[in-house]
Swiss-Prot record:
Function as written in the Swiss-Prot or TrEMBL entry: S-adenosyl-L-methionine-dependent methyltransferase that catalyzes the methylation of the guanosine nucleotide at position 6 (m2G6) in tRNA(Phe).
Keyword tRNA processing: yes
Family: Belongs to the methyltransferase superfamily.
SUPFAM superfamilies: S-adenosyl-L-methionine-dependent methyltransferases (SSF53335), THUMP domain-like (SSF143437)
GO biological process: tRNA methylation
Lineage: Bacteria, Thermotogati, Deinococcota, Deinococci, Thermales
Pfam families the record matches: NFLD, THUMP, UPF0020
The protein, known as: tRNA (guanine(6)-N2)-methyltransferase
Main location: cytoplasm
CDD domains, sorted: AdoMet_MTases
Amino acid sequence: MWLEATTHPGLEDLLLEELSALYPGEGAEVDARKGRVRIPRAWVGEEALGLRLAHHLVLFRARLLLSREDPLGALERAALALPWPELEGAGSFRVEARREGEHPFTSPEVERRVGEALHRAYGVPVDLKRPAVRVRVDVRGEEAFLGVQLTERPLSRRFPKAALRGSLTPVLAQALLRLADARPGMRVLDPFTGSGTIALEAASTLGPTSPVYAGDLDEKRLGLAREAALASGLSWIRFLRADARHLPRFFPEVDRILANPPHGLRLGRKEGLFHLYWDFLRGALALLPPGGRVALLTLRPALLKRALPPGFALRHARVVEQGGVYPRVFVLEKL
């Protein structure tokens, strides 16, 4: 048996560190397929639901090679041969199938075949909308994996919907925090806060000993972000209508700046984005002490590098994936 946790492709090493810290010495490893980390576990408690870099958690119980002659029958027999203690006395369940690759059957066919077999065996009613137990059958190429999904919804949905409307997930915001080495007590700025995801993730991770500032020019978005912060019990975040091109006018010195700047679609030509980067980075340089860091996302890495002022050193870069888009993460340090 093993626990599989999913994340954004490109963040597997960070999730591996988090899992290894939660379950030290148990052999966590990155899966060959992108966006997955696994660790041998026979049982998982509530502690796993506090993972900040994971979307979903699945406790897998079996792995098998599919028979070419009767693959659906093989899945049914494998499911019936396994113990399913979660189904004993459960109010409802459903089977969720995920397929990768070409197969002579569909995901609904897998769900129906395995679901009917488990229903006959345990007498538990099927509920496709809000099941008490989610049985997972993942078919990846010629292999199949059977287990139980531990998460009803993604762990990344930890804030009100208003804070999740932007392009950045809390998992990516958490990655920026870790790559910037943000620690409790540090002062943090989110200068393009939008719906507030970065600010909320920073405040909920670092706690009230860390002042968190959040700025944006859009009053409506700032209002939604404030509401989300209050609903999340993060009342110490300081929201301010501010122009990220002139940071020193609005904010005091900070230790870390975490940013998801506009990608240029609303700024017109590349020159508009270049000047935004130019002004923002010089303002960031003015706010940071030596050793202070900026962690940001960009879809225009060459443009950002061209706008980089003297006084910053590039400490880290990586590509991540979110929803079919591949932004670059940069970590800059003031010299």
